């Protein structure tokens, strides 16, 4: 093989390695975002009994407390 052919193959190998490394980073970032969303949901959906009872009377969900007062809504967001 000529020197030019070896250089082309080397460049192709480097390009392949660089793109696979980027894909792994994007996948890791996506997994990290999914974990953060799960944590946020579990924190906001967990309310105390007083809040749950207060909102249950209004046929709504307890979304936590704001300034010490229960916050009720049909659907809780973040």
Swiss-Prot record:
Endpoints of the signal sequence: 1-24
State the disulfide connectivity. 51-63, 55-72, 62-76
Instruction: Fill in the domain comment.
Output: The presence of a 'disulfide through disulfide knot' structurally defines this protein as a knottin. The cysteine framework is VI/VII (C-C-CC-C-C).
Q: Which organism is it from?
A: Conus tessulatus (Tessellate cone)
- Which domain of life, per UniProt? Eukaryota
GO MF, one term, reads: toxin activity
Q: What is this protein called?
A: Conotoxin TsMSGL-13
* Record Pfam families: Conotoxin
Q: Which InterPro entries match?
A: Conotoxin (IPR004214)
Which family would the database say this protein is a member of?
Answer: Belongs to the conotoxin O3 superfamily.
Which keywords does this Swiss-Prot/TrEMBL entry list?
Answer: Amidation, Cleavage on pair of basic residues, Disulfide bond, Knottin, Neurotoxin, Secreted, Signal, Toxin
């Amino acid at each position: 093989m000529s020197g030019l052919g070896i250089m082309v193959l080397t460049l192709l190998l480097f390009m392949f390695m660089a793109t696979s490394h980027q894909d792994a980073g994007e996948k890791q970032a996506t997994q990290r975002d999914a974990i953060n969303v799960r944590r946020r949901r579990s924190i906001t959906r967990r309310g105390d009994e007083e809040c749950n009872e207060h909102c249950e009377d209004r046929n709504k969900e307890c979304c936590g407390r704001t300034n010490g007062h229960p916050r009720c809504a049909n659907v809780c967001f973040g």
